[in-house]
């Protein structure tokens, strides 16, 4: 369904930290997630889209570029269905060739004209990471919104009270990976939410 392998180390975005915790069974956690989706009233299509977009995000990390020509322009040599570009495109339900072209040779507006600009490997890789983060951000926000819509009882009256919440952060940017930045982002958003609504 999601075209992902069983080897976590195939996915750089989710394998940079500790990948195995003895007390956690990943299959059992997936079942709990599925049960939670059902309890919260997610439709089959919504669950499918969430899984596919998540597969697309983690597969983005496997897209690699090589330098082509003297201009150091990036290109992606393998774009078949079993490659990371193919898996990303399949998960996002888009054609892989325009997707990779958008990373390697994006169209930019210069004055009133649209031009194609060749990217270096570093620029193309940064674009891939940016799109993966943007998709992750939107999926996460959608999940929170969907949960809130299900859990919030509009008939309850608001009561005024004062609350203080401080969530510890781990801002060691030289060492933190994507996972820790995501955790910090969630903590900040939770603190903003509680400060605003409590």
Q: In which residue ranges do the predicted regions lie?
A:
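N-terminal switch/interaction subdomains of large nucleotide-dependent motors and GTPases
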Residues: 1-198
């Amino acid at each position: 369904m999601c075209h992902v392998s069983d080897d976590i180390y195939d996915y750089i975005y989710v394998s940079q930290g500790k990948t195995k915790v003895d007390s956690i069974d990943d299959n059992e956690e997936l079942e709990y997630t599925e049960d939670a989706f059902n309890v919260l009233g997610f439709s089959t299509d919504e669950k499918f889209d969430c899984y596919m977009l998540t597969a697309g995000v983690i597969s983005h990390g496997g897209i690699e570029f090589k330098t082509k020509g003297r201009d150091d322009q990036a290109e992606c040599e393998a774009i078949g269905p079993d490659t990371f570009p193919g898996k990303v495109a399949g998960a996002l339900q888009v054609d892989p060739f325009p997707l990779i072209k958008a990373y390697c040779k994006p169209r930019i507006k210069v004055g009133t004209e649209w031009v194609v600009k060749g990217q270096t490997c570093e620029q193309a890789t940064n674009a891939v990471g940016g799109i993966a983060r943007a998709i992750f951000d939107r999926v996460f926000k959608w999940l929170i919104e969907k949960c809130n819509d299900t859990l919030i009882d509009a008939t309850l009256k608001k009561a005024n009270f004062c609350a203080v919440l401080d969530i510890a952060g781990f801002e060691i940017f030289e060492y933190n990976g994507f996972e820790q930045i995501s955790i910090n982002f969630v903590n900040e958003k939770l603190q903003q939410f509680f400060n605003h609504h409590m």
